[in-house]
Amino acid sequence: DPNNDYSIPYFWGTVGIVYDKNQVDIEDLEREGFEIFRDPKYRGNIYLYDSERDSFMMALKALGYSMNTSSEKELQEAYEWLVSCVQTMKPEIVTDEIIDNMAQGRKALGLIYSGDAAYVMAENEDMGYYLPESGTNLWSDAMVIPANAKNPELAHEFINFVSDYEGAYDNSSFVGYTSANQEVMDTLYGEGGEYEGIDAYMPRSGYPKDEVFEYNEDTRKTIANLWSKVKIAASNAE
């Protein structure tokens, strides 16, 4: 829905690296980008996100490819990159538990959504958020009304409620994800706001190497199958 003809965004952001400033050298992040997840210095001290889409995005971007590639060769290279990571780095593959775990400083770094990183940084000032120069995923969460909705008028009212200032403010301030309401975004990130100075709350925009996912069912199936094999490799790693 490139023109937002059928959907209304309520959150937006990026996927990047959350890191403990006391354990991770910023020079390593700047030099390696996503390759830091294969840096032996951080072996056993990283989180990967249990999402085939985000994990393959990371690998493809580390290799210099588009995250929307359908090339069998490039997807195979990304698969091999991830297998190398899980076999040598002993990552912990997690989902939402990364939020509290990183807020408590349990590992040095992890792959994370910007909204979750903003929450982590608000809870722990020793945490930072880094976006590699190779680019990343620029995403949005949106609401749609199905064509066969039984009460479209009420659905529109709900969308208006979530999108207006009060609803959008409460939603964004509670979870840490960046609001699609410009006024709310400016308030929360600005002076005196709950996320003042927290870079993860203000997503990078206009960067040419950042991409929005383009849905491809065949590629989705391929990546899902390969990610299952990556997790098997992780479980068999010594």
Protein language model features and the residues they cover:
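Ligand-binding "clamshell"
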Residues: D1-N4, Y119-L131, G193-E196
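Sec-exported extracytoplasmic/periplasmic mature domains
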Residues: D39-R43, L60-Y65, V83, Q87, ...
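Solvent-exposed loop/turn segments at secondary-structure junctions
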Residues: T14-V15, Q23-D25, G44, E52-F56, ...
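Conserved C-terminal helix/tail region of periplasmic/extracytoplasmic solute-binding proteins
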Residues: D100, R204-E238
